[in-house]
UniProtKB/Swiss-Prot annotation:
The lineage of its organism: Bacteria, Pseudomonadati, Pseudomonadota, Gammaproteobacteria, Enterobacterales. The record marks 182, 243 as: Transition state stabilizer. It comes from Yersinia pseudotuberculosis serotype IB (strain PB1/+). This is Acetate kinase. Belongs to the acetokinase family. Keywords: ATP-binding, Cytoplasm, Kinase, Magnesium, Metal-binding, Nucleotide-binding, Transferase. The active site is at residue 150.
């Protein structure tokens, strides 16, 4: 089978992750990260041929300068690789209700991404910049750009899952509903779980837990999403690195009325100063929480709240599985590496038949997948995610 090389771009507000992946076998030829955009220390780091390299982009550099560097410096050193590029895949955080699957980028698609900016004000504008710069930098691939939406996998949710108990007109007229996030990751690990269990995806019932600086849980029934913890925005749901997740909405009124905080201040509090950072008042890093759980009250407090919330979601989503749960799957930076998070969470779910195997749990870290429960237990798995591969495969499929 001939190779299908795809450039995968993930543009954030102040960074750009990139990789060149062979969609036929998953081989990663180049990967890198440009970061600190708009700052004096803007830099780019990349790996190629097993070696790591780094360079300054220049003070104030952003997406345009980063893509220019990728094209004119990194790929210029690999002309054969550059000549074999067949498509460009773009990760898009929010596609609203308009996009239920990946699509080739057109003017209509660009407008749809713009229309979803209110629901992803930091991410979607950056994605649009990435698309515009890719179209300029790779004119030969102008009709080979593909948008892959984090929200698409969740578009199979039934109405009872995605509607809020608000006036229905807010949904009909303004699109206020649950959309979810991390859909590409939830889809990937669901596929991998089906392979491990030797079961068709359409018959698979799993609960997938994508745990990183942002985190979400998804109920997958018969291979399709039927509920997910993130909502209109990625603020709802689990305790995250700096995001609060679920809370009583009246707290917002109290912060404003009784404490004099502005809407902008409350937004900053809930999105950038809460979660693990808020609970520890030290850091958003789960490694600190895990390393200091036994000795520091702030770490124990944060870990206990984090795992309590996660266990509640897993427990409640079990009720949506029509009487059969094949597995719980952990993925993402925390899900793949924080053995303590997995153990403390599953220990709360003994009633559902989970019993952790300590040795297996400790072994399934640092990129290693595997079963983490005892043979007599209900199954829990660690499966490292690979969102970039899904994006590359979708881009290759749609542009074939």
């Amino acid at each position: 089978m001939s190779s299908k090389l795809v450039l995968v771009l993930n543009c954030g507000s102040s960074s750009l992750k990139f990789a060149i992946i062979d969609a036929t076998n998953g081989e990663e030829h180049i990967s890198g990260l440009a970061e600190c955009f708009h700052l004096p220390e803007a830099r780019i780091k990349w790996k190629v041929d097993g070696g790591k390299q780094e360079a300054a982009l220049g003070a104030g550099a952003a997406h345009s300068e980063a893509l220019n560097f990728i094209v004119n410096t990194i790929l210029a050193q690999k002309p054969a690789l550059s000549a074999q590029l067949t498509a460009i895949g773009h990760r898009i955080v929010h596609g609203g209700e308009k996009f239920t699957s990946s699509v080739i980028v057109t003017e209509d698609v660009i407008q749809g991404i713009k229309d979803s900016i209110p629901f992803a004000p930091l991410h979607n504008p950056a994605h649009l910049i990435g698309i515009a710069e890719a179209l300029k930098s790779f004119p030969n691939l102008a009709d080979k750009n593909v948008a892959v939406f984090d929200t698409a996998f969740h578009q199979t949710m039934p109405e009872e899952s995605y509607l809020y108990a608000l006036p229905y007109s807010l949904y009909k007229d303004h699109g206020i509903r649950r959309y979810g996030a991390h859909g590409t990751s939830h889809f990937y690990v669901s596929q991998e779980a089906a392979k491990i269990l030797n079961k068709p995806l359409g018959e698979l019932n799993v609960i997938t837990c994508h745990l990183g600086n942002g985190g979400s849980v998804t109920a997958v029934r018969n291979g399709k999403c039927v509920d997910t913890s993130m909502g209109l925005t990625p603020l709802e749901g689990l305790v995250m690195g700096t995001r609060s997740g679920d809370l009583d909405p009246a707290i917002i009124f109290h912060l404003h009325d009784a404490m004099g905080m502005s809407v902008d201040q409350i937004n900053t509090l809930l999105t950038k100063e809460s979660g693990l950072l808020g609970l520890t008042e030290v850091t958003s890093d789960c490694r600190y929480v895990e390393d200091n759980y036994a000795t520091k009250a702030d770490a124990k407090r944060a870990m206990d709240v984090f795992c309590h919330r996660l266990a509640k979601y897993i427990g409640s989503y079990t009720a949506l599985m029509d009487g059969r749960l094949d597995a719980v799957v952990f993925t993402g930076g925390i899900g793949e590496n924080a053995a303590m998070v997995r153990e403390l969470t599953l220990d709360k779910l003994g009633l559902l038949g989970f019993e952790i195997d300590h040795e297996r749990n400790m072994a399934a870290r640092f990129g290693k997948s595997g079963t983490i429960t005892k043979d007599s237990s209900r199954l829990a798995l660690v499966i490292p995610t690979n969102e970039e591969l899904v994006i590359a495969q979708d881009a290759a499929r749609l542009t074939a």
